[in-house]
Amino acid sequence: TLNAYCALRKNAFDIPTVHMYDLYAPMTRDFEMKLTFDQAYDLLLEVVEPLGKDYQDVVRGAKDSRLIDVYETPNKSTGAYSAGSAYGVHPYVMLNFRPELDGLMTLAHEMGHAMHSYYSNHNQPFAKSDYTIFVAEVASTCNEVLTIHALRKKHEGNKAAQAALIGRMLEGFRTTVFRQAMFAEFEMIAHNMEEAGQPLTRESLCAAYYDLNKRYYGGGCRVDKLVENEWMRIPH
């Protein structure tokens, strides 16, 4: 459960209380992964081997064809994104690659989206090629899980690496399952407020979001008041 996960972090960090910001700290500082984009891509090609040679070849071709905007540049949008909605056009991927584990995980995630779009567009007519956001995240998180499993095999016997990688997987589960469910519930609350004729103000939305966080995390984590503003920075 979510409360058990908060308790695990409390024990791992040996702290009296887990705050919301403690959920984003790495489980250990004794493991650090540094790699270039080329190294990350070569590793990704190994990671997706279980998905078949055709999948590997298309992933390899995306890099060779310069379909990925890799590095941060002035005035470039933050984050990462896969643009695959143009039917008949190979998906493009935007990254702001960082030479560390998070950079590798983001690459794997976005290429999962790109490959989903590629196969959907190549196997479905235009009218049926689109997919829901919920289904889209299956393809991307699958690549994340494959990446963690591959890294754990590469670092077998390294306790610090195992702790870091398992912690990364657990945090991914929290943000992909629990956090996204909370976002969906917040959207439903906002729509219900509007349909009931209630004004959608910063104060009312912040109060609703704060109450949601207390319901989800209150049993194992101190929900600081500032978290009520988090909904404003979630783009999608």
PLM feature spans:
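Cation-handling catalytic/transport regions enriched in His/Asp/Glu
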Residues: 1-236
